[in-house]
Amino acid sequence: MFYSENYDVIVIGGGHAGTEAALAPARMGLKTLLLTHNIDTLGQMSCNPAIGGIGKGHLVKEIDAMGGLMATAADQAGIQFRTLNSSKGPAVRATRAQADRVLYRQAVKVALENQPNLDIFQQEATDILIEQDRVTGVATRMGLKFKTKSVILTAGTFLGGKIHIGLDNYTGGRAGDPASIALADRLRDLNLRVARLKTGTPPRLDARTINFDILAKQHGDAQLPVFSFMGSVDQHPRQIPCFITHTNEQTHEVIRNNLDRSPMYTGVIEGIGPRYCPSIEDKVMRFADRNSHQIYLEPEGLTSQEIYPNGISTSLPFDVQMKIVNSMVGLEKTRIVKPGYAIEYDFFDPRDLKPTLETKAIKGLFFAGQINGTTGYEEAASQGLLAGINAGLFVQEKESWFPRRDQAYMGVLVDDLCTLGTKEPYRVFTSRAEYRLLLREDNADSRLTPIAHELGLIDENRWARFNQKMENIERERQRLRNIWIHPRSEHLDVINEVLSSPLVREASGEDLLRRPEINYQILTALDLFKPAMDDKEAVEQVEIAVKYQGYIEHQQEEIEKQKRHENTAIPDNFDYTLVAGLSNEVRAKLEQHRPVSIGQASRISGVTPAAISILLVNLKKQGMLKRGE
């Protein structure tokens, strides 16, 4: 039986990828359907209750700059906000929010249910209808079929999902939710490469049984950051602290003594887990010299008694999990309310996708999220947004769009996946981007909002606010360029008081702002350079643009230069162990493959463009580059 209405785009799955994938074409004016097995779990945070972090916060800002939901939901649900790397350069500063699971889910559900052009239907999708290598519809468990021109699959860990606790296992998409077995079987019949990955989650603890009095507190920032360019601090709910404890030798002994009951160490689990979010078993075995590991006790919400112990993801049996928890300071009498577990699931080789996230084999079929081999809410959401945009463009027979590596972290993510593929869950880091000074959190809107407006993704309020900010930036920079101070000026004494060395030649306001001891606040407190702007976002961009102007221009030149290094030779005896800045993973692959050129090195799976930039710098230092390279 076919449903009475046809849809332009159908999205399967209502997680972080599915949410953004459904909203994007709907905002573009296309009739969109979101199919989910449970409307009440839309936007569910399946693992850690947090949004953002290093690299991930950049993705959230980019999603927001293009009209996406994640940043707004985080602002409405964040119960502890922090700016990570705040003492470092602007390229690596990142926003992170501890989130209330219930508030986050509510924010997502409200946005979806009130989005024009978007319908939501609760049914498990069991088949994707295909004719002559083109998508034509979706079939559901109850036999109902929907006609469509495009399908976006965002099934997360649900495809063939298998949950492991100790040596026991059962099918499931996550704890409490069924796996998508029929759809997984159907997809395995398609001309797409499929494999298995694994991820895990820690046990949840009863806050009433934790001795917080003897634990260190971790508060959020005094000056709360905001995720959305349209957001404000007033949207944030009440802020609360996290707490810190540590594993110890007793904890590690419990783990070592029970590895024969671990599904990972007995070969029961075959899927590869995330390198940068290892289980506590892996931490203890891989870092045998460490006597302890820091564990963050993160509240799951303002009205919840559940605590998320960040750092002890495990699939060991429940009785072992209890011993692990009770071995730590402050948790001696703590009860577990939900056991930790590992989950294996199907993922598809992202090298079978176009950079638009459309499959190469089937027209109109797009993949987004964990089924492409990524890990993390933010990575999933950014893929969902990109797939949603391109599904919308596809049904309108318009030219596709995807960001370049020098344009967005979304571009880095998609290029890495579609070009290199992955054999382990992939997450974004700032170190993966070779042009990260151009890809800051603060300028995500200037990079992407004009494109979003052209694509029809943002409303006129956001567009007007963006243009006002851009005008404020340009007006203020022009004002500072036009104000000059001379060595014989009457204002000289006052200005010299804030300078590390006296002024000996004329300087503009921008010249002074470039000096390391001067910031915008100090400069505009001086009578000559008053008044300061009220637009704090514009102030931040003015200061960064002025102080880092030379570096920014250099990176823009590097973008053009990078294209010329395809045939740059690497000596046979080149010693990669002497190259500072390469990760152990990249160094091992270069040693193994011994590439003969930069071009060849760049195509080795796992060797990032950032690593190529480091190699080029070292080759230049050693006089191995020809003039002009």
UniProtKB/Swiss-Prot annotation:
**Keyword Cytoplasm appears in the UniProt entry:** yes
Is Flavoprotein included in the keywords of this UniProt record?
A: yes
Names of the cofactor(s): FAD
Give residues annotated as binding FAD: G13, G14, G15, H16, A17, G18
Q: What InterPro entries does this protein's entry cite?
A: FAD/NAD-bd_sf, GIDA_C_N, MnmG, MnmG-rel, MnmG-rel_CS, MnmG_C, MnmG_C_subdom, MnmG_C_subdom_sf
Localization in the cell: Cytoplasm
Which one GO biological process term can you cite for this protein?
tRNA methylation
Instruction: List keywords of the entry alphabetically.
Output: Cytoplasm, FAD, Flavoprotein, NAD, tRNA processing
Residues the entry annotates as binding NAD(+): 273-287
Main location (coarse class): cytoplasm
Q: Which GO terms describe its cellular component?
A: cytosol
Q: Which PROSITE patterns match?
A: GIDA_1, GIDA_2
What PANTHER family does the record point to?
GLUCOSE INHIBITED DIVISION PROTEIN A, PROTEIN MTO1 HOMOLOG, MITOCHONDRIAL
The Swiss-Prot or TrEMBL record describes its family as follows:
Belongs to the MnmG family.
- Function per UniProt: NAD-binding protein involved in the addition of a carboxymethylaminomethyl (cmnm) group at the wobble position (U34) of certain tRNAs, forming tRNA-cmnm(5)s(2)U34.
Query: Per its record, how is this protein called by name?
Result: tRNA uridine 5-carboxymethylaminomethyl modification enzyme MnmG
The species this protein belongs to is Mannheimia succiniciproducens (strain KCTC 0769BP / MBEL55E)
Gene that this polypeptide is encoded by: mnmG
